[in-house]
C-alpha cells in the first residue's frame, strides 16, 4: 500500500510541487488601525479601490467603502470582535461576487449565498458581481407584458408590467409586505422566478413568510435572502444588491424575475449608519449625499430586455415605510421619483377594515393600460369612471343632500365596486376571474344584491362556472378578451345561476 500524505498519494503531491510557481509575488497588505461597530480603518492599503474585497488575518472578509489619505474604511462581513488592532489585511484586487443558480430556489440564504435554513449545501451555477451597470436604452424594450399580482385593486387600477419598478409605501403595519407576498404567491401559476430580500427583518417575520410561501406552493420558485437586525451592517447593506445580481443572472437567461426589497427605508438607515461610522460628511437627515444614487442605481437595473438579449425581465417591488402617512420625507420622495409608480397604503383605510388599504387616489402606475390585457382594459376603464363618480357624489351624502335616482344609482354601483376591491390576505385571484368579477359589477348584474353580499355572489358564480362551464374560463384565459361569444355566455349563465342558486333573483336575501 502506497504511503499517502494529506489524503493524496506521494506521486500526486510531487506533481503539485512541480506545478507550483515559486517566483516572487507582489501583494498589497495593510494593518488594522481601529475596529468597531462592523467597520475597520486600515492603513497602508494604498492601491485599494472602492468595492474591493479584502481579507483579514483572522479570516474575516470585508469590502472597501471609503478612501482617505492615510487609511481606507472597510465594512466587515463578519463579527468585528474577531478582528484586532494591528492585524494584517490582504488586498485581493477583486470585487464582491455572489453565487447564483436554480439550486437556490426554495432556499433561505444570507446575502453572500450561504444557506441559513439548515437545508444543506447549495451548488452554484455561476458567480456574478454584486454591482452591475443597468441595461442601456438600446438593450431594453417597452414594458408591455402584464405581471398579475392576483390583487383586484392593483391589476385593474394600478397595473404592473414585467420590467417595471413599482414602489409600495405606507406606515408600519398597513399590509405592505402582504401585498408583496401575495404577488409572489400569484406568480406560481406563471413561471416567474421570485426573489424576496428581507433587510433587517425579525427572525419570526422571516419564518412566517417562508411558511406562508410553502403553504401556498410558492416557495419552490422563490429565493429568500434574509438579514436580521443584529447582522453586521455590511450584510444589511449589500443584501438588495446581492438579490438584484442573482435576479439579473436569471433575466439574462430569458427568464421573468420578480424581486421584492423589504424594505429600502431600513436599507437607507443601514447605509446612513455605515457612512457615519466611516466619518463621511452627512447630508439631509444625516444621510450621505449619494443615497439617491445608491437607490437609483439599484432600481435602474430592473428592465425588460430586448429580444436579441433573450427577452428576459426583472421587475422590482421596493417597499418604503412612511411615518404618520407623510410621503414627502426624504427617502419616500427619492423612491417615488425613481420608480414607475407607487401603491400607497392608507392607515385610515386600514383601520376602517379595508384590505388591502390602497389609496387609489394617491397610487399610480406610469405604465398604465399598456401592461394590461385587452379584457382587463375593457372593464377597468368603466371601473375607474364609476369609482371616481361614486367618491364625488358620496361627498354630498355627508351633508344630507337629496339626490336624484340616477345619482343614487351611481352611488349604489360605486359601493358595490368598492366592496369588490376588498380582498383578504393571500386570496389571490386569476386574471380571468378578475375580468368576470368587474364585468358583473359594471354590467349591473349585482345592483339588486345588498352590498355585503356581492362578494359572496361573485364567489358562488365563479365556482358555478368552474363546475359547469369551465370552458368559458379557459377561453377567457386564452383570449384575455371579452369577445361577443364570452359576453353572451356570461349573461346566459348568470341568469341560469340565479335561477338555481337564488330561487327569486328579485329577492336575493331569501
From Swiss-Prot:
Family annotation (PROSITE patterns): ATPASE_ALPHA_BETA
Sorted UniProt keywords: ATP synthesis, ATP-binding, Cell inner membrane, Cell membrane, CF(1), Hydrogen ion transport, Ion transport, Membrane, Nucleotide-binding, Translocase, Transport
Keyword field contains ATP-binding: yes
Site (Required for activity): 363
InterPro entries documented for this protein: ATP_synth_asu-like_sf, ATP_synth_asu_C, ATP_synth_asu_C_sf, ATP_synth_F1_a_nt-bd_dom, ATP_synth_F1_asu, ATPase_a/bsu_AS, ATPase_F1/V1/A1_a/bsu_N, ATPase_F1/V1/A1_a/bsu_N_sf
Family according to the record: Belongs to the ATPase alpha/beta chains family.
Assembly with partners or alone: F-type ATPases have 2 components, CF(1) - the catalytic core - and CF(0) - the membrane proton channel. CF(1) has five subunits: alpha(3), beta(3), gamma(1), delta(1), epsilon(1). CF(0) has three main subunits: a(1), b(2) and c(9-12). The alpha and beta chains form an alternating ring which encloses part of the gamma chain. CF(1) is attached to CF(0) by a central stalk formed by the gamma and epsilon chains, while a peripheral stalk is formed by the delta and b chains.
Record protein name field: ATP synthase subunit alpha
Source organism (scientific name): Dictyoglomus thermophilum (strain ATCC 35947 / DSM 3960 / H-6-12)
Amino acid at each position: 500500500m502506497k504511503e499517502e500524505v494529506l489524503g493524496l498519494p506521494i506521486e500526486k503531491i510531487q506533481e503539485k510541487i512541480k506545478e507550483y510557481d515559486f517566483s516572487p509575488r507582489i501583494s498589497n497588505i495593510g494593518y488594522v488601525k481601529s475596529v468597531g461597530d462592523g467597520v475597520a480603518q486600515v492603513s497602508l492599503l494604498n492601491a485599494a479601490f472602492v468595492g474591493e474585497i479584502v481579507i483579514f488575518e483572522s479570516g474575516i472578509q470585508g469590502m472597501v467603502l471609503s478612501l482617505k489619505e492615510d487609511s481606507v474604511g472597510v465594512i466587515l462581513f463578519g463579527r468585528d470582535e474577531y478582528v484586532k488592532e494591528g492585524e494584517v489585511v490582504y488586498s485581493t484586487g477583486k470585487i464582491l461576487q455572489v453565487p447564483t443558480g436554480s439550486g437556490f430556489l426554495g432556499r433561505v440564504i444570507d446575502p453572500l449565498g450561504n444557506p441559513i435554513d439548515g437545508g444543506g449545501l447549495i451548488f452554484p451555477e455561476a458567480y456574478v458581481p454584486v454591482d452591475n451597470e443597468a441595461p442601456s436604452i438600446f438593450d431594453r424594450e417597452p414594458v408591455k407584458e402584464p405581471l398579475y399580482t392576483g390583487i383586484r385593486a392593483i391589476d385593474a387600477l394600478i397595473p404592473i408590467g414585467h420590467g417595471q419598478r413599482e414602489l409600495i409605501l405606507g406606515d408600519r403595519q398597513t399590509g405592505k409586505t402582504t401585498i408583496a407576498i401575495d404577488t409572489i404567491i400569484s406568480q406560481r401559476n406563471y413561471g416567474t422566478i421570485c426573489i424576496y430580500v428581507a433587510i433587517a427583518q425579525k427572525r419570526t417575520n422571516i419564518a412566517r413568510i417562508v411558511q406562508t410561501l410553502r403553504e401556498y406552493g410558492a416557495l419552490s420558485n422563490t429565493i429568500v435572502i434574509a438579514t436580521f437586525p443584529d447582522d453586521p451592517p455590511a450584510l444589511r447593506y449589500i443584501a438588495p444588491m446581492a438579490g438584484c445580481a442573482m435576479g439579473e443572472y436569471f433575466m439574462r437567461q430569458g427568464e421573468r424575475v420578480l424581486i421584492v426589497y423589504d424594505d429600502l427605508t431600513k436599507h437607507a438607515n443601514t447605509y446612513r449608519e455605515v457612512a457615519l461610522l466611516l466619518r463621511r460628511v452627512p447630508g439631509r437627515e444625516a444621510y450621505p449625499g449619494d443615497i439617491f444614487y445608491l437607490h437609483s442605481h439599484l432600481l435602474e437595473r430592473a428592465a425588460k430586455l430586448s429580444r436579441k438579449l433573450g427577452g428576459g425581465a426583472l421587475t422590482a417591488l421596493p417597499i418604503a415605510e412612511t411615518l404618520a402617512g407623510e410621503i414627502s420625507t426624504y427617502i419616500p420622495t427619492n423612491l417615488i421619483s425613481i420608480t414607475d409608480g407607487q401603491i400607497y397604503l392608507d392607515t385610515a383605510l386600514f383601520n376602517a377594515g379595508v384590505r388591502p388599504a390602497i389609496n387609489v387616489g394617491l397610487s399610480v402606475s406610469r405604465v398604465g393600460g399598456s401592461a394590461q390585457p385587452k379584457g382587463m382594459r375593457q372593464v377597468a376603464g368603466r371601473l375607474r369612471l364609476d369609482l371616481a363618480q361614486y367618491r364625488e357624489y358620496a361627498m354630498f351624502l355627508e351633508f344630507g343632500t337629496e339626490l336624484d335616482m340616477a345619482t343614487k344609482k351611481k352611488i349604489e354601483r360605486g359601493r358595490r365596486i368598492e366592496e369588490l376591491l376588498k380582498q383578504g390576505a393571500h386570496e389571490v385571484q386569476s386574471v380571468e376571474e378578475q375580468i368576470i368579477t368587474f364585468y358583473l359589477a359594471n354590467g349591473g348584474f349585482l345592483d339588486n344584491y345588498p352590498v355585503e353580499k356581492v362578494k359572496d355572489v361573485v364567489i358562488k358564480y365563479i365556482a358555478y362556472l368552474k363546475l359547469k362551464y369551465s370552458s368559458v374560463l379557459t377561453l377567457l384565459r386564452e383570449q384575455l378578451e371579452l369577445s361577443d361569444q364570452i359576453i353572451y355566455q356570461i349573461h346566459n349563465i348568470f341568469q341560469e345561476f340565479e335561477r338555481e342558486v337564488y330561487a327569486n333573483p328579485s329577492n336575493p336575501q331569501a
